A protein has these predicted regions:
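Residue-level "micro-hotspots" composed of small/polar
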Residues: 21-49, 76-82, 102-129, 163, ...
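Residue-level detector of Asp-centered blade-edge/turn motifs that repeat once per structural unit
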Residues: 49-52, 87-90, 135-137, 170-172, ...
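Conserved beta-propeller blade signature
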Residues: 54-57, 91-94, 139-142, 175-177, ...
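Loop/turn residues immediately N-terminal
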Residues: 60-64, 98-101, 146-149, 180-184, ...
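Short loop/turn segments that connect beta-strands within beta-propeller blades
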Residues: 67-70, 105-108, 152-155, 188-191, ...
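Cytosolic signal-transmission helices at domain junctions
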Residues: 322-326, 759-832
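Helix-turn-helix DNA-binding segment
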Residues: 866, 872-930, 948-951
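Basic, Lys/Arg-enriched C-terminal extension of HTH/homeodomain DNA-binding domains
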Residues: 932, 936-953
Length: 953
């Protein structure tokens, strides 16, 4: 016991002798996640990671998960604190307050808590807090103060302590536990055996964590007794140089065979090596949220996760970029750097700083022993003929060790270069002019300024023809030839894209102009500037602000405030962007200093940044991407897929996930996706497409979510991929789903519609058939009618023809009747002549008629007889022509006499009264009287036309 106290005192003295503060100039980047960021409890007690890369934290409010972009909380059913978590057997086992169980995905890919309390007897279900969970093989062990539980194949076994179980952990893949009265126990063959007796342990010994250490041993941290090394032979104190052992240690984790991290209750985090030497320390001063570390974890990419008393912090251990911003800099901006004669120098807005130089592989591990040797703005550091010079706001200085000697104070100096073919001639650009110096015997002698140029010369370069090229911010580019003292201004008239924003640099012994439209070169033959054909293939016509060649021949550049490198180490040039520094470099005063292939320094807004470019390229792990969430958007969003395809800790398929079928009215979707590349989230871009909707992949962008709304019925595959700044792409991950037809278009509806359509078609067919039949019948009737009409028309025409013929015949008969009537008239006249003759004879003086006269008379009488025969013939013809008119008339009116029948016949022939009078040998008056009498016999009203009456008989 005495030796233990001596050890503690020695450790305290060793610690007290250490220099407090930042030990090295370089500092790793720290990312802090505050409580308001992850929206859960304050404290985080344990940390785990699954094979997909997601992180899990035992949090005061539940199990907290993080995938690089999204946080999600899984509270326990009883809403209590989660003290412990352990990834085992493809499940995340969880220990809380009076709760024990595991998280595992359901069929929808969402994590669901499954309680294991039902496996315990009722008497064992009140166990308070589960502080530790460990597993070996299929055995899962849980520790509460009063019990140890072992889960194996769905069965739970309970182990009681002699008094209290203080700790549970693993030593060389064996389960150990600290029993308050018996000491450290080891689980062997189903039993707990004493491994380290209590009397061999320090007083008030309380283990807080254990981790693998050197081969066959482990490191133990305690709350009061410092650090210990545990082996099969026993336990002994362990000292870490630079660490006070007399403090509360909370956790220790092995990073690799050379590096370890150690968490404390009040002093932050230590990083130490296999030699037990502190390499780095991290506290609130270096950027942690607080110094109280509850848990530590090293993920698969060697990143360090810290569960703090308030929040979560993250350090990318293998990050190739470090901050160079010691407290001495006072957050001054970094403008230039140089290494000269075992000294490293920094030019900043706060002065010129010197640091003793050791040739290390990683210069960020140079000890923080900075000295400000010259206060005030320093623009440029450069070595001329093995002498270091500094261009400052108040003049040109020569630097030697920790001293700054004035060379010229006529003006502030931006830049200085030697002539390519005359190394002793130094060309300087100042605030007001270009001034020449002769470098001789380690001293600069002022030769004088160039009279043909006046103005600020911040950017200049020289070539082998003794030309000095100066770019002016708004005039163009000047060429000053020292041979003939000529000066010429080049503008857009001489090939430059503009007189604005031209910057001259010398790359690979060639003068180049970085412009708003790409890189331009000088064509000496044409005395013009032309776009460089070589750089056009790389940059195109994009704006370039800065160019610098490193020791390997790679070309660093700044484009739209973004830093990049033309990597020439491969078979063809490739561009590598450094997005981690976007917005952090010193815009307008960009500076890159390349010391060797492991150390490149970039001027920043606060200090500098160191990049190990070789490591930067090597650190790019194969990219993974997964779809973490698929939601159906609506009045209330519902999760369709929760991001887990299979068990929580198994390698999961990235393609053809899902195959969900979604109702038509739920046809708007929200997709979330992420690549759990924690150390380089700023380097990632994503591209997606929805097969069945998008024709092409989207442009690369930083978004990690995508919405699709009002999708039509059909099958869809959402695909997404990631790429980093090295243009490495991840495999494509995909999610399949189907938007079902609306209810009125589902299979049953379609079947019903088919049947209904068949019925409708049948009915339509019948209707059409009936319609066609009716139309056919109508057409037949119409044809028959037309035929009938045609027949009737034909009949009418025949009748008309017959009538016309009859009329013709009637006219002919009437003509004959008229002729007959005329003959009768003539004969009547003839009779009158006979009468006259007889009267004449009667008056003749001759008393007797001679035979000749008698014969003549007889002959006339014979003709009279013939006349009567002709009337009979006339009657017959008249009846034939006029439909037996006389017969019908005599039958209808038998009272009519012969002369009245004749009168009727003549009237029927529509003869005039005069003509009738002649035929009937009466006067016209007599005809009228006869007509009157005839009307009376026929009983014809006065208003009836006699001819019309007779015509209708």
């Amino acid at each position: 016991m005495y030796s233990m106290k001596n050890y503690q005192l020695l450790a305290f003295l060793l610690f007290s002798s250490q220099i407090l503060g930042q030990p090295f100039i370089g500092q790793r980047e720290i990312t802090n996640y505050e409580k308001k960021k992850y929206n859960a409890g304050t404290q985080n007690w344990q940390i785990q990671q699954d094979k997909q890369g997601r992180m899990y934290f035992a949090n005061n409010e539940g199990v907290l998960s993080f995938d690089g972009n999204y946080w999600e909380l899984y509270p326990l059913p009883n809403k209590t604190i989660v003290w412990s978590i352990e990834m085992a057997n493809n499940k995340l086992f969880v220990g809380g307050q009076d709760e024990i169980g595991y998280l595992s995905p359901n069929d929808g890919g969402q994590l669901v808590f499954h309680s294991l309390k039902s496996l315990l007897d009722e008497s064992d279900q009140k166990f308070a807090d589960i502080w530790n969970i460990v597993h070996v093989g299929e055995d899962i062990f849980f520790r509460s103060i009063s019990r140890l539980f072992k889960l194996n194949k769905g069965k739970m076994k309970v182990y009681q302590p002699s008094s209290t179980w203080f700790f549970l952990g693993k030593f060389q893949n064996k389960v150990i536990a600290h029993d308050e009265t018996r000491g450290i126990m080891m689980y062997k063959n189903g039993n707990w055996e004493v491994f380290i007796k209590k009397q061999d342990l320090p007083e008030n010994f309380y283990i807080t964590s254990i981790s693998d250490y050197t081969q066959g041993s482990s490191i133990i941290t305690t709350s009061k007794n410092g650090l210990f090394q545990l082996t099969e032979e026993g336990i002994k104190p362990l000292t870490i140089k630079g660490v006070n052992n007399n403090q509360h240690f909370t956790s220790v984790v092995k990073i690799d065979e050379f590096n370890y991290i150690l968490g404390t209750y009040n002093n932050g985090l230590y990083l130490f090596n296999e030699k037990n030497e502190v390499i780095e320390s991290f506290s609130k001063q270096e950027g942690l949220q607080n110094n109280n570390l509850r848990s530590l974890y090293v993920d698969k990419s060697k990143n360090i996760w810290m569960g703090l008393n308030n929040g979560i912090s993250f350090i990318p251990f293998n990050n190739a970029i470090k901050d160079i911003n010691p407290v001495n800099f006072g957050d001054g901006s970094g403008y230039s750097m140089a290494v000269h004669k075992n000294h490293m120098y920094f030019a900043s807005s706060n002065g010129t700083f010197e640091l003793p130089f050791e040739n290390k592989k990683d210069l960020s591990y140079l000890k923080n022993d900075l000295t400000n040797i010259s206060e005030g703005q320093t623009w440029k550091l450069g070595i001329l003929n093995n002498q270091l010079y500094a261009g400052k706001e108040d003049g040109l200085y020569q630097i030697e060790n920790k001293n700054a000697k004035v060379v010229d104070k006529k003006s502030g100096y931006w830049i200085f270069e030697t002539l390519s073919n005359k190394q002793n001639i130094v060309v300087t650009g100042s605030y007001e002019q270009v001034r020449l110096f002769d470098h001789n015997e380690g001293q600069l002698k002022d030769i004088g300024n160039i009279k043909s140029f006046a103005g600020s010369a911040r950017f200049l370069a020289t070539d082998a023809d003794q030309n000095i090229w100066i770019s002016h911010p708004y005039r163009g580019v000047y060429k000053i030839n020292l041979k003939d003292s000529s000066t010429k201004l080049y503008t857009s008239d001489q090939g430059l894209p503009s007189t604005l924003n031209n910057h001259v640099y010398k790359i690979k012994n060639k003068v180049l102009i970085a412009t708003e439209r790409g890189i331009f070169e000088y064509n000496e033959v044409n005395d013009r500037f032309e776009m460089s054909s070589y750089y056009k293939k790389i940059y195109g016509d994009k704006s370039v602000r800065y160019l610098k060649e490193d020791v390997l021949g790679n070309i660093w550049f700044v484009q739209d405030k973004n830093l990049g490198v033309i990597d020439l180490s491969g078979p063809k040039p490739s561009i590598v962007y450094i997005p981690e520094l976007n917005g952090n470099i010193l815009s307008g005063f960009e500076n890159v200093y390349s010391y060797d292939k492991y150390n490149t320094f970039i001027g920043g807004q606060k200090g500098f940044y160191q990049i190990n470019f070789e490591k930067y390229k090597e650190n790019i792990n194969p990219l993974k991407i997964f779809i973490r969430n698929v939601k159906i958007k609506g009045d209330v969003d519902s999760v369709l897929f929760g991001g887990y395809h299979g068990d929580i800790n198994e390698e999961q398929s990235l393609s053809n996930i899902g195959n969900a079928k979604v109702a038509y009215q739920l046809n708007s979707f929200h997709f979330e996706y992420v690549s759990p590349f924690f150390e380089q989230q700023t380097n990632l871009e994503y591209s997606y497409r929805l097969k069945g909707f998008d024709k092409t992949w989207s442009d690369w962008n930083k978004k990690t979510e995508k919405d699709y709304t009002n999708l039509s019925t059909g099958y869809y595959v959402f695909e997404v991929k990631a790429r980093n700044n090295l243009n490495n792409e991840s495999p494509v991950t995909s999610y399949i789903f189907q938007v079902l037809p609306p209810w009125y278009f589902n299979i049953w509806s379609i079947t019903f519609y088919g049947i209904l359509l068949f019925i409708l078609i049948y009915l339509l067919y019948k209707l059409q058939a009936k319609k066609y039949s009716k139309r056919y019948q109508e057409q037949q009737k119409e044809l028959e009618l037309k035929h009938q009409i045609e027949l009737e028309k034909t009949d009418k025409e025949l009748i008309q023809l017959k009538n016309e013929k009859l009329e013709t015949e009637i006219e002919f008969k009437n003509s004959e009747l008229a002729s007959s009537a005329m003959n009768l008239v003539q004969k009547k006249e003839f009779i009158l002549k006979i009468k006259e003759t007889l009267q004449h004879l009667n008056k003749s003086e001759k008393e007797s008629m001679d035979s000749q006269d008698l014969k003549k008379l007889l002959r006339s009488l014979s003709e009279e007889e013939k006349l009567n025969d002709e009337w009979e013939q006339f009657s017959i013809h008249f009846n034939n022509v006029h439909g037996d008119f006389l017969i019908k008339l005599s039958e209808k009116y038998p009272i009519l006499k012969a002369h009245e029948l004749k009168l009727s016949a003549y009237l029927r022939m529509n003869l005039t009264s005069k003509e009738i009078a002649q035929l009937m040998s009466i006067s016209v008056r007599g005809v009228e009287i006869s007509r009157y009498r005839l009307r009376k016999k026929l009983n014809i009203p006065t208003e009836t036309n006699l001819f019309q009456f007779l015509f209708e008989i």
